[in-house]
Amino acid sequence: MTTTAVTHIASLVTNDPSLGNGTPLGLIQDAAVVIDGDRIVWTGESSKAPATDNVLDAAGRAVVPGFVDSHSHLVFAGDRTQEFNARMSGQPYRAGGIRTTVAATRAASDEELSANVARYLAEALRQGTTTFETKSGYGLTVEDEARALRIAGRHTDEVTYLGAHIVSPDYADDPAGYVDLVTGPMLEACAPHARWIDVFCEQGAFDGDQARAILTAGRAKGLHPRIHANQLTYGPGVQLAVELDAASADHCTHLTDADVDALGQGDTVATLLPGAEFSTRATWPDARRLLDAGATVALSTDCNPGSSFTSSVPFCIALAVRDMGMTPDEAIWSATAGGAAALRRTDIGRITPGARADLVLLDAPSHVHLAYRPGVPLVSAVWRSGQRVV
């Protein structure tokens, strides 16, 4: 295989505390990275880099791991601009919310949906995202949910079955019947196309008992749990996530002390989604409280047409630092290694020998600029699995 060295990196974020300055980011100054095929095979000081077939001079710019976006909803059609405009104008809007997207998604062709996913993922890639999870949840029939997962699987191997996004409009008068569908025929059709199962555990969606039944059924089919938890109100979602060893509890906006302690002591990652609070003018999650309790925190976009229509992880990093109590170091770790932890992956989110060669070259000397210069397109080059893709 051809080897490539990226040299003269001003600041390299490895996410290996044993390297560099000994912090969680494992920062190495004046660094180099060697790529062989799809893997990283060497990191260290630029002056000590081994000979390679190709050399790229970073010219004093920073390199960070590819961003890991562990929560998105990309298989959809249409948009919800009217809803957003009404919300930002302080006007009531009752035209359907998620149901609006469900109707548009059901009406779209496979080709239209796949093209939409490809477009949003290309948009994210240009901003440094090299790993992305995405969900179903805008079909809410057996056929449409399975179709969404098949389409998602063309673009990523981190696919989540979210038949339990809301109760389908077709079952508005029979929510128990819809839970039976989600845990029965829909699960049978969807399980072969997904790695994960998710549920929106919230007032107006699924209560704790329903969420438990859905996640337990999915686990019996080999799908690992994730959960939308405690976004709009206090509720049982976080405690259920920890109890069921869910990989991630997502949103985590309204937390009791017991919720925070459970996340601090368990293996479930608290995935924070600042784009949702930004887009809805809602209360910000308290990242500082979680971090101080010892919780593992991930940052993700929650890219979706209703409450967080952004594919930009750098934007979410800036929000987390400005409004959620995170330091720049904590935010970059959460958007890379934290996202990897939320997907229970050890091959991504870091720049160390053996990891997948996912790198982002910034047009800046330090990762801090991602928060320091919000809205500025700082991504200069992106490698995914050893291939330069931007």
From Swiss-Prot:
CDD domains: Imidazolone-5PH. Its cofactor is Zn(2+); Fe(3+). One of its GO terms (biological process) is L-histidine catabolic process to glutamate and formamide. Signal peptide: none annotated. It catalyses: 4-imidazolone-5-propanoate + H2O = N-formimidoyl-L-glutamate. It is found in: Cytoplasm. Belongs to the metallo-dependent hydrolases superfamily. HutI family. This is Imidazolonepropionase. It comes from Streptomyces griseus subsp. griseus (strain JCM 4626 / CBS 651.72 / NBRC 13350 / KCC S-0626 / ISP 5235).
